[in-house]
Amino acid sequence: MRIIDVDSHFQEPFDWFETANPTLAAKLPRMSVAEQLIDIAVGDLFSSVPPALRPDPLKLVPDEVRKVYERFLAGGDPPQQIIDAGAFLPAAHLPEARLAWMDARGIDKQIILPSSGYHPYRHAMRNAPELALQTLETYNRWATDRVHGHIDRLIPAAVIDLIDVDWAVAEITAMRARGARAAFVKADPHDNKALNHPDFERFWAAAADLGVAILFHVGGGRAAMHPGWANNGGDTTAFFRLASLSRRMVPQLALGAMIFGGVLERHPKLRIIVQELGIDWLPDFLMAIDLEADNSRPRVLSFSLYRLPLKPSEYVMRQVRVSVVYQQDVLRPTIDHVPKGLVVFSSDFPHAEGSQDAVSLYDAQLEGAAAGTRESFFGKSAEAFLGI
């Protein structure tokens, strides 16, 4: 049985950006470890809160997590959970060590996304947006250089912003030539335009023609929240949990735009993987999108008949896969209530949300599952879907 891991990461060396592009790094001050922690833990949440209502960001980080990181910043040991996840192993950023780590777990191939490699881009978008695309170019070339000679098993994901479509098409084309078969694209409007806006057609066409899968990953999109939800008398924990609930809307809105906007119909070779955004929303989502297309009972607010040739759920099964992450998702019963092959395996290595033992942990959860479910989940579905 082949095992394909559709969501893993580099844990880039702390000085990767300064080493990869010292001239650009000099124009964009380095984020501290504390700033990176805040960006990881509450960055997407914080951006939805008006500046006047924003509390101290460290107050949004759970007390124990904050204390552990404060000890780490003062020269102590890193958080045990991060150690256990493998973030400090050579396999976190060195290709030969990564391949040995994969071999020990029976993993054949991995898609690899950034960790701190994404931070210069986010930092630039807040402080020097004119440099943002250059930070992505720097990361994309660092990542493809890192796995050079191993792209048969280690599949680098380019990071793409659609704010400049000419740049996006050129970058995805260049990165495909360097071995990238996936592209991390924010599951959000770009340049205040929906993902199905005509301006983006050239990019979706290029991705489909190049055989580059689109990745909608956590942290690359957020569901809009009314700012008033943050104005609750100072209960930041309650607000944080509301924001966590809202994240399940991110993939639903992004996929809805791609389906109902006709993007998947116009580009049948386009492939999308939703990563680390949960799986428990899937059964309800599949039912809801098909109800929206049921012309026997048109809804008043739909305003017109559904005219695409396939049911929305059929576009999902043809062109979408959704991956799990161990600290968030339990396979059963969700995987029993969606079409076989829709939910696929990932380890999230070396992030704490995943597990180094993800293969065995998920294998145990699949005991007694329907025939073929295990093989499809671990690799058969992703292999056929991605053509790898």
Write out the residue ranges for each language-model feature:
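Flexible loop residues that form catalytic
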Residues: 9, 115, 188, 220, ...
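Catalytic pocket-lining loop regions of alpha/beta-barrel enzymes
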Residues: 131-134, 147-153, 160, 166, ...
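Active-site flanking residues adjacent to catalytic metal/cofactor-binding acidic residues
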Residues: 4-6, 216, 275, 347
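Well-ordered mid-protein domain cores that form the structural environment of catalytic cofactors
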Residues: 129-136, 140-141
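Divalent metal-dependent hydrolysis catalytic cores, especially in the metallo-beta-lactamase
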Residues: 8, 79-90, 103-124, 153-161, ...
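A short secondary-structure junction motif
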Residues: 123-125, 287-290, 366
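Mid-to-C-terminal alpha-helical segments outside catalytic/metal-binding sites
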Residues: 1-4, 12-90, 94-104, 108-109, ...
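Short glycine-enriched, charge-decorated loop/helix-capping segments at active-site entrances
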Residues: 126-130, 360-362
